[in-house]
Amino acid sequence: MTAPEGTLESFLEGDCSVSEPLAITVTALAFVAETLAGVISSGPLNGRLGEEVGANSDGDRQKKLDVVADELFAGALAPTPVRWYASEERPTAEMLNPEGTLALAIDPLDGSSNIDVNISIGTIFSVFEAKESGVESFLRPGREQIAAGYVVYGPQTVFILATRTTLAQFVLHRGHFFLVSDSLRIPDRTTEFAINASNYRHWSRPIRAFVDDCIAGDEGPWGENFNMRWVASLVAETHRILTRGGIFLYPADARRGYGQGRLRLVYECAPIAFIVERAGGKATDGIDRILDLTPSELHQRTPLVFGTAEKVSQVCAYHDLPESEVSPLFGTRGLFRA
C-alpha cells in the first residue's frame, strides 16, 4: 500500500539515507506519538495523568503518564528491528527483538511536571546501530547516532526527525504526520536565552557572568536587549530555538545532586545535540561538544548548553578565562565589544 503523499511514511520511503529497519522503527514511534497526542489532548478526561505513581531508578518522581508512555513505546517497538531499548523509566537496557539491528534510547515523556498545567510536553529518542550488548549499544559517543528526534505535544503535535543527512519537521493532521519543512536551520543571531534564573546563586561564575551580560542589554557587551524564556520542558525549549533561535542553558550548579547537571546524556542531551548540529547550531556541556562525550553509565547526567552557534561559543569562551577574569562586570571590559 502506497503511503499518502507528503506524509512521514512517504518521506521515509523516498529518502535513500533511511534504511528499512530505521523506517519501520520511526513509523512505530510516530504511531505511539499519535496515540499519546490523543490521550494528552483529553487531559483529565483520561484520568489523573499527572498523578505521582512512584520513582524511577534514578530517583526522579514518576507521573502516571510517564509510565503509560514508556509501556506504549516498548510495546510498539517490540516487533520492530529494535534489539535494545533504553528508557528513562527503566533501570537498564532491555532486549526487545533478539534479531534486531538497532538500539533505541528514549525519554518517553519529557516535561511531565507540566502535564496538569497544559503546557507543551514531549518525547525524545535516539537511534544507534545495535551492538552485542545493551551496554555497548548505548555507552558510546553521540556522534555515532544514526538518527534522533523528538515529538512536541502542544497546540500542534510536531514530529522532528534528524538523520545523518536530513532534518525534517512533520505536523499531525487527521491521523498522519505531514511534512511541513525539510530545511530547518537555527537563525545565526538571537536575542533570547533560556535558563532557570531562580538558581542564579548556585551557578559557576562563568554562567553568572554570561547571564549578567545578557541582562545588561544594550548597555552590555552584546549591545542589544535580550528576553529570557523558561518552560521547564526540554522539547518545547528546543523547538522554539530550532524555529527562531536562542540559547538554552541547564548548567551544573552547587546544589546537591546537580554537580554534573540534571539532564541525561544518552536519551536527552545526545539526541538534542544531534538535531541542533544538523540545524547549524552547537551543543556543549559548557566547554566540550556533547556529541564527543562518551557516557560511562546509562543514566549519566551532564550540563547542557545549546542553540545559536555564536552564543554557545561565547559561553565556552567565558569558561576558558582564568577565574580571576570572570565577573559580572566582565562584559564592560569588552571581550566581545569591538
From Swiss-Prot:
Pfam families: FBPase, FBPase_C. Keywords: Calvin cycle, Carbohydrate metabolism, Cytoplasm, Hydrolase, Magnesium, Metal-binding. One of its GO terms (molecular function) is fructose 1,6-bisphosphate 1-phosphatase activity. The keyword Metal-binding applies. This is Fructose-1,6-bisphosphatase class 1 1. One of its GO terms (cellular component) is cytosol. It comes from Bradyrhizobium sp. (strain BTAi1 / ATCC BAA-1182). The gene is fbp1. Substrate binds at D110, G111, S112, S113, N196.
